[in-house]
Amino acid sequence: MKISPLCPSCLLGRVYYEAKLVTDDEDLISQCVDESLKILAENYSSRPINAHLATRIHRRVYEILGVEDPYAEVKARANEVARQVLPLAKEIVEGSDDPFKTAVIVSIVGNNFDYGVQGHKVVEEEFRDFLKRKVQEGLKINDTERIKELSSGKVVYLTDNAGEIFFDTLLMKEIKRRCEKLTAVVRGRPIISDATIEDARLARVDKIADELLTNGKGAIGIIMDELPDETRKALEEADLIVAKGMANYECLSDGSLKPIAFLLTAKCEPVARDIGVNVGDMVAKVVE
């Protein structure tokens, strides 16, 4: 998915958000915005994939701020909220008529742990009620039966956010019961609110998946040229790729890797429009 005219304002908003997480120095924040504008000006006209451009911008901002992980406290908070709500989520999945479908929905509800997205608020304090309400609301696009059918061979699960990854474990367990091999992939370095190896271990993903890999240098989503050989091989040999979140959708929706199950909450207009849903809708869409 190529960058939309709406994307730059959101990117700059997120730059400001993450800079404010670590400093009140207006000159330093302005430098972050200035550098981001330069990168946008140099690259926007070529219509790159938004997540690829965002990766370049956030890496530069981190350099300016001199901080490895501006979102560290935010991610820790998300993980703690998710850890506390996970027993309820497990109860909802296990008590449903279709645990696989419900685990898909719960994992997508977890996709709301996405900080700094323009117009999107993470409801930490009321997440229990939010979870129950969204499960009742259900999916706008529901390809869960096809996802279940495709989960028999080698499955690669591309994670997205910290916090969210706790809810992913419920779906991973459902997939693990059916598949030949389950590989989970996280970010190789801290980038925005995305899950890294540390978050995966905290959520005990390493105890569920047969293999825990990274996307290399910590890109937002997937940049094929940055993938470690073992991750690229796993993706190329997968019978199903489960791709969580909007960044993975942006990176892979026009690519050749298939079949892919895109599981996400459409949190912005460009992604919602590209999929054909409304902002706020939950999507489980298979592309073959």
From Swiss-Prot:
Highest rank taxon of the organism: Archaea
Covalent S-S links between cysteines: none
Intervals of motif Subfamily I GNFE-like motif: 247-250
Motif (Subfamily I CxxC motif) on chain: 7-10
Entry-linked InterPro entries: ARMT-1-like_metal-bd_sf, ARMT1-like_metal-bd, Damage-ctrl_phosphatase, PH1575-like
One GO molecular-function entry: hydrolase activity
Keywords: Hydrolase, Manganese, Metal-binding, Nickel
Top-tier EC class: hydrolase
Cofactor dependence: [2Fe-2S] cluster; Mn(2+); Ni(2+)
Pfam families: ARMT1-like_dom (PF01937)
Residue sites binding Mn(2+) per the record: 160-161, 194
Recorded coiled-coil stretches: none
Motif, Subfamily I KC motif: chain positions: 267-268
EC number(s) from the headed UniProt entry: 3.1.3.-
Main function: Metal-dependent phosphatase with probable damage-control functions. Could hydrolyze oxidatively damaged purine nucleotides or their biosynthetic intermediates.
Domain notes: Subfamily I proteins are distinguished by three conserved motifs: the CxxC motif localized near the N-terminus, the GNFE motif localized about 40 residues from the C-terminus, and the KC motif localized about 25 residues from the C-terminus. In the crystal structures of the subfamily I proteins, the side chains of the cysteines in the CxxC and KC motifs face each other across the rim of the putative substrate-binding cleft, and the GNFE motif lies deep in the cleft close to the metal-binding aspartate and asparagine.
Family: Belongs to the damage-control phosphatase family. Nucleotides phosphatase I subfamily.
Protein name as annotated: Damage-control phosphatase AF_1104
Native source organism of the sequence: Archaeoglobus fulgidus (strain ATCC 49558 / DSM 4304 / JCM 9628 / NBRC 100126 / VC-16)
Source species taxonomy: Archaea, Methanobacteriati, Methanobacteriota, Archaeoglobi, Archaeoglobales
